[in-house]
Amino acid sequence: MTEEEKINGENNYSASNIQVLEGLEAVRKRPAMYIGDISIKGLHHLVYEVVDNSIDEALAGYCDHIEVTINEDNSITVQDNGRGIPVDFHEKEQKSALEVVMTVLHAGGKFDKGSYKVSGGLHGVGVSCVNALSTHMTTQVFRNGKIYQQEYECGHPLYSVKEVGVTEITGTRQQFWPDDTIFTETVYNYDILATRMRELAYLNAGIKITLTDLRVKEEDGNYKQEIFYSVEGLKEFVRYIDSSREHLVNDVIYINTEKQGTPVEVAIMYNTSYNENIHSYVNNINTIEGGTHLAGFRRALTRTLKKYAEDNKMLEKAKVEISGDDFREGLTAVISIKVAEPQFEGQTKTKLGNNEVMGAVDQAVGEALSYYLEEHPKESKMIVDKVILAAQARVAARKARESVQRKSPMSGGGMPGKLADCSSKDPEECELFLVEGDSAGGSAKQGRNRTFQAILPLRGKILNVEKAMWHKAFESDEVNNIIQALGIRFGVDGEDSKEANIDKLRYKKVIIMTDADVDGSHIDTLIMTLFFRYFPQVIQQGYLYIATPPLYLCTKGKVKEYCWTDQQRQKFIDTYGGGSENAIHTQRYKGLGEMNPEQLWETTMNPENRMLKQVHLENAAEADYTFSMLMGEDVGPRRDFIEKNATYANIDA
């Protein structure tokens, strides 16, 4: 963008563009309503709200560099080189436009169509929400050759906007300190921020995002830093997601167009895996529950591929009926669209409801894919051959499921014989423990509360579904036992489909309970992979948990304490043993089977005392990449990951 264009843009972006919708008081009273929650997720959401403002400037064409810094004191600084928030007088509010943006909820250029055609941010509450939830916030605006500043406490300005210097740059710098009386966690996680910044860089090609952590110095003496920048955007994004998978076709099928007034960008790649991995975004928001844009994409993909295959008489050898699922096996795709007024619905407000979008995406994908298939007959044949193989495997899987249901020794009501069910039939209160090994399963069965806790022992390591064909999973006893115990069906409205249906889910808490060792962690990961690939809705709706049995029982005389970490154990030694390890008795639990039923209940199963880790699907594309890298065929990336995360690997699935 030329300086002249930027100056014209500055002239057009002023106080008159700032629209005000409502006041701030409610935010501090009900923060979760505005940012999702007040734990680690909400804490990081504050950063995303500020960065979204800068991304909006970039989408409008006025900004190409965003710097995000985690400061030593866990405050955050975000600076961009956009036009700077307007500082002129706002007629209606009778104060500076900057103060309006910073102190009034839903005030900002994103609500005035002339300023931004589209804007990011799921909750769209703007930077004022961040201000309200911070003990202190400082805003500096670089605009018109001057530096303007205002500071706030809990959303209230400490003084009017004032000039504090001169400058040759333009942009906005925000620094904020999250309020520890509101947030249960105030320590920022670098990896969580890096994941989102990487995602934003891929979704917005040409924008440089620098992330720096002033709390950590590298071996070379410099602060920890990454620069996220993508020239090719979505093309690079699908390559990144698929980096540990074997490609079926080396091409990335790339679509970047506008249909019916909706900008549509799509990147498609086929690999040799058996999973469908489609990640959809609206205005940079990950629409985990899909919506009309995803429906339009699927419709176009199925119709176009099927027509090409039929026209070229390629389906005659299939001998089975082809369904929509079959066209998507081994597919990795990213769909990114921009919508002026998105309507979000669904359980987590991440499902797009705009009907007009379906036709736009359908048309864009249909036209581009049809052209690609005609121009690349060799690659097209490889894709269609994989579709036929997928259809045959799906039919084999259905037969395997039916066969298991006929043959397997079931307890009453078609449940696995090993399942020790609970007496309650209310899914809201029922819990299912997936327990490693029969001996631990025995202790769990004796120690549980039979009213609402069910136990399903698993024999050894379950099948790694990342490497298995679809029908192989249904030939596995352990996988089938889990599916049947949970009451999961496949297919919607009687259709033979891979889509999991959890409408009749029997337990709203599914708890993985394994030994606190390497083998136990491996089993955790195998089970999480099964859920992520075959019935991700269980994770999306927050029903999957991991139990955390204690590592030690420390005893000194009559004082007993269970310890979950080495730090807790050390604290016990310092408190009761005068710092001497020999002065206390430590029992190290190597497995669940070493605990008697009462101990297992007391430490790991009793809702009053236990600690559960909820498995979140925070970032589907990153989880997709992590699972394929950890559980796939390629050893190199897995070794690198394990070496980098040797002491602590956080699979934020």
Report each predicted region and the residues it spans.
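GHKL-family ATPase ATP-binding module
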Residues: T2-N17, L24, L46-Y48, D56-A58, ...
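A short glycine-centered beta->alpha linker in the GHKL/HATPase_c
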Residues: G84-F89
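C-terminal interaction appendages of subunits in large macromolecular complexes
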Residues: Q392-S411, D426-E431, G442, Q446-R448, ...
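Helical (often loop-to-helix) elements that flank the catalytic cores of nucleotide-handling enzymes
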Residues: E91, E345-M358, Y562-Q568, F572-I573
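Short adenine-binding "F-helix/F-box" segment of the Bergerat
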Residues: H90-E91, L98
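Conserved short strand/loop->alpha-helix "switch" segment adjacent to the catalytic nucleotide/phosphoryl-transfer site
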Residues: K29-Y48
